[in-house]
Amino acid sequence: LKNKYHEVVSDEYTAGIAFLCRVINFLEDVLEDAECDDIYVNSVALNARTVVLHAVRCKYDVFESIEVFQDRYRVNVKEGIGDLPLRELYEHVIDYYKKTLHRRMKQYAWKTHISGVEYYLGVLFNGKGFLIEGEKNKVILPGTPQCFSAHTHPLDPPVPSKNDVKAVNRILVDRGIGHVIEAVRSSLAIYRVRPLSLRDYETLKSLEKKGSFVEMIARTADGAAIRARYIH
């Protein structure tokens, strides 16, 4: 990063995104371990960084699963009434990003629009984040596992390049939630909407060499595992 701009970004917004990512991974593991039909969380408690959950028709003791996983993901868990199903939490992460860090990345998208130099934002699972300057028309791919990331794009609307597909894959393989490509007028969010299977991961790795975004969406469980939508 010699002579390149870089900044540690650690605030309530990076912490909020990381918390939601950890909650999702926690719920996925509990759901699988206890073999529940579904699992809900309380949306009000979630805003206070607490997990109040209600598991539906579990084959095994859900409390044992909670004990196993809550320390691993550093979440406070209580039993109660839930109104937000796990399947909607993935969208919740994108919406939270849109209300928070999205505006900041738009400012850097303008810089990229003028100079062509791209900027990358990474959010770690511990709530810390970083913002780094890359090269012209080239995104930087740090090796540190991240739960969410975004980078700026010089063209509008943003069309994922081979490097962009690689960035998305890196996030998903590390059990992150998604990646946003930020352009001046529109932004493309690419994210998972359920746990990825081993077959999904194998498909992602094979498509990384091709760099085909359309094929990545289509071939990953017929589009069910990964979703893309524009945010403004």
List where the protein language model places each region.
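Active-site-proximal loop/helix of nucleotide/amide-processing enzymes and allied scaffolds
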Residues: 1-80, 134-232
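Short beta-strand scaffold segments in enzyme catalytic cores
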Residues: 117-125, 180-184
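Short, compositionally biased leader-like segments
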Residues: 71-96
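Short N-terminal edge-element motif at the start of the domain
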Residues: 89-114, 125-126, 131, 138, ...
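N-terminal start-of-chain detector that recognizes signal peptides
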Residues: 90-96, 120-121, 150-155
